[in-house]
Amino acid sequence: MKRFLPVVVAFVPAAVFLGARGPAAVPASDSKMATPRYDKTGALVRPEGFERWTFVGANIGMSYSQEAQAGPGEFHNIYTQPEAYAAYAATGRFPEKTMFLLVVHEPAQKVSINKSGYFEGPMKGLAVSVKDREHSPEGWAFYSFDEGAKLAATAKAMPTAMCFDCHAKHADDDHVFVQFHPILRQARPRSP
C-alpha cells in the first residue's frame, strides 16, 4: 500500500475537482451512467464492469517519489465512464458522479515467446477518484481498494492531504491530470 500511495496521489489523471473552470456542478450526463455506490458507513463500494468503460490513458513507472525504481515500474491503466468522457468532450467539464479508476499491474516479462520488453502481469491495486459533492464537500474524493494481496470490497475516502491537495494544485483541468493523457487532451473542447 505504501508503495502505491504516491502513484494514487498523482493518478487521477485525470482526477477531477473544482478546477480552473470554477466550482459549479455539472449534472450527471446520462441516467445510464454508472454512478458511485456507498455502503451505510459512507465507504465507496468497489466499482464493477469498468473494463468496458472508456480507456483514457496509461503510464508505466510513474511515481512522485525521488527514489529510483528497479525495473520498469508498475503499469497504470485509467478508465472513466463513457458518459463522463462524452460530457467532458462536449463541455470541457466532468459531470457529477464521474469516476476515474486507476488499475495497477505488476510488470512481467520472459513468459512464453516473449524474450524482451514488458507486459502487464497480475493486477496489484485499484484506486478510484469520485466527483460527488453529496459525499465530498471538496467535490472530489480518492479511494484505495488495496488490501494486501486482494482488493477490498469497500474503501473509505483518503485524507485530502494524500491526493486531493496535490490534484488541486497540479492537475491540468478540474482536478484531473489531463496533461498526462492524450485521449483527454484531444477530447477537451477548443475555444473558437
Predicted regions and their residues:
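Signal peptide processing junction and immediate N-terminal pro/mature segment
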Residues: 17-28
